[in-house]
Amino acid sequence: MKFVFIFIFFLSINLYSQYDLKYIGNISVIRNNQKINLDNAIKLYDKDIITTENDGYAEIKITGKSYYIANNGKVNLDSKNAELKKGTIYIRNNAFKSLEEFKKYDNDLQIYADPVPLYAGKMGNIFITSRDEIKIKDSKLLGSSRPIVKFFEVKNSDKKIKIYKSVFGIYVGAQDEKYQFVCNMELKDKTLLNLAIDIKLDFTPPPPKPKQIQGVTSTMTNIISNPQKSKEERELLNGKIYVLYSPTNYADKVYMMPAQGRYSSQFGAFRGYTKDYARYHQGFDIANSNGSPIYAANNGVVKISRELFVRGNCVVIDHGEGVYSSYFHMSKLIAEEGQYVKKGDIIGLIGSTGMATGPHCHWEMRAGNMTFDPLSVLEKNYSDIKDIKNLTRIK
């Protein structure tokens, strides 16, 4: 009976696909929830889990292709496929001469992020640098909220380095422990690259109760009691405007404050309009007298200049590469849809139309169809390799 059991055990092992493994540095393999001893070259099977440490690099042969796992990676083998859980994996038809050669190859492509950790309600940047042109086929930031993460090549002083940049917002109410940046690329030599990099997220917990807004008007009560109209307005902006990406960057590096006056409400404030209606404030409010000018915070193309149900008289400017600024509650619209405006041009006048208790400019910034604190764009944006090298490298 003992011999029959052993025979069945080995037969079940052989029913799984086998894969050759080579590695350098420290790696580990988990099989049936147990860590196995490693020789210099061993056989792997479906359901095995390979983890590479900071100095570990590995190669696996699967159906005639070479799968290369970079350091700090985690891969599950299943049905003749290497499923990436964390880190970076390269898929090639032609093998490297050695894993040392692959290690050097892997170091060419570098990824930087700012800030690290990411912060809920703030603007985020991810930069990919390489000596050769790369095709970024798909990229996502996985978490409770999922901003659009799309990359554009940017010019820089080092002609030997290609830089690809993505700008996005992180939802102000996000409370994740981390987000995961996932991306699929094709390199110049036709190597396929998949990566999954965890980035820590920090956030400010909301107060136990929202701050109640004083002076709620009958107009505001009517807006709150008509959720269908509010939904249609969101679908217009979020589904047809903010999701559009212009490949041209119209904006200067630094934005300007769009109005003068008293700063009446900060971005991210948790506010209650009625007993049952509370929201995070998605913009930055500047209060002033009715009819005071509102300026374009930067260069761009006007996508919306019309009266909306919730936002009142509203102007939305496309600054390119997925970045938009919006200005709500105007008493008068001046900029026209389709018009190119320059930073500092008057686009409208302060008012209290729509969901407003008094005259003010609600200034909103979005990137990747996600709002972020507008004050963050008043500082210099990163675009040159000299600036990027000072950021936190995440790969």
Describe each PLM feature range:
Residues Q18-Q34, D46, T51-Y57, K65, ...:
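Glycine- and acidic-residue-biased ligand/ion/polar-headgroup-sensing regions
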Residues P293-K303, A335-I350:
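Short, well-structured beta-strand-loop connectors
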Residues N313-V316, Q339-K389:
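Conserved, short, structured surface segments that act as functional micro-motifs
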Residues D20-G25, T51, K80-D108, K211-K253:
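Polar, low-hydrophobicity, Gly/Ser/Thr/Asn/Asp-enriched low-complexity stretches outside signal peptides
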Residues L99-P208:
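Cationic-aromatic interfacial patches
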